[in-house]
């Protein structure tokens, strides 16, 4: 569309140049007089005006291109900003939906509690007192359990100690080297008895 418009402008503005070319070619076939020279000057003036208009048109087109490029950059920047804002809004929407879902869950959980109604201050103090008594009882039971456990551990350690002592008395540790030395000594004192014993065995 724009190319067609440009071509139509150039087609219209080509006329002064064509007239000048035609007149210059006509000078070769006829004599040049003052009237023809004035006509030629007029054609040159028209051509100069044509070039001036063409230059102005080119300058105007360049300005239009600059304006168009500026508008294009603004539009692109605006589109990028809009995309970023849309993405942020989508994230905010997801967060809001998640918060709404949690609130609905909290409301469902709170309905049974709220349906019972709020207790009076006296009832709350009584409940707190009962809880404190229960805590004290549990602490006392824990302390007694620790004492009993320590006592049983001491008794077990003492019993184990006594058993080890009794075992050392009933079964004293033997020394293999001393037993072998005693056997050799007894054989040295009675060699005949040892040999006779071997002979009988044979």
Swiss-Prot record:
InterPro entries documented for this protein = THOC7/Mft1
Record keywords, A-Z: Coiled coil, Cytoplasm, mRNA processing, mRNA splicing, mRNA transport, Nucleus, Transport
Location of this chain's protein in the cell: Cytoplasm; Nucleus
Q: Look up the record and report any one GO term of the cellular component aspect.
A: cytosol
Coiled-coil residue spans? 53-151
Q: Gene deleted: what happens? A: Results in increased levels of H/ACA box and C/D box snoRNAs.
Query: What gene is behind this protein?
Result: tho7
Subunit info? Component of the THO and TREX complexes.
The identity of this protein, by name, is THO complex subunit tho7
Originating organism: Schizosaccharomyces pombe (strain 972 / ATCC 24843) (Fission yeast)
Q: Which domain of life is it from?
A: Eukaryota
């Amino acid at each position: 569309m724009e190319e067609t418009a440009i071509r139509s402008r150039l087609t219209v503005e080509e006329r002064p140049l064509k007239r000048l070319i035609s007149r210059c070619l006509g000078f070769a076939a006829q004599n040049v007089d003052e009237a023809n020279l004035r006509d030629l000057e007029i054609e040159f003036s028209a051509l100069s005006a044509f070039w001036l208009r063409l230059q102005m048109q080119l300058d105007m087109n360049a300005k239009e291109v600059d304006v168009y490029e500026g508008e294009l950059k603004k539009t692109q920047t605006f589109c990028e900003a809009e995309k970023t804002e849309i993405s942020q809004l989508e994230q905010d929407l997801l967060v809001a939906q998640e918060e709404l879902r949690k609130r609905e869950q909290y409301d469902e959980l709170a309905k049974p509690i709220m349906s019972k109604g709020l207790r009076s201050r006296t009832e709350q103090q009584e409940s707190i007192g009962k809880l404190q008594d229960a805590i004290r009882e549990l602490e006392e039971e824990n302390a007694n359990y620790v004492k009993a456990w320590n006592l049983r551990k001491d008794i077990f350690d003492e019993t184990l100690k006594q058993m080890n002592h009794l075992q050392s008395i009933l079964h004293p540790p033997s020394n293999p080297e001393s037993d072998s030395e005693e056997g050799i000594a007894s054989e040295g004192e009675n060699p005949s008895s040892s040999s006779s014993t071997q002979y009988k065995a044979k």
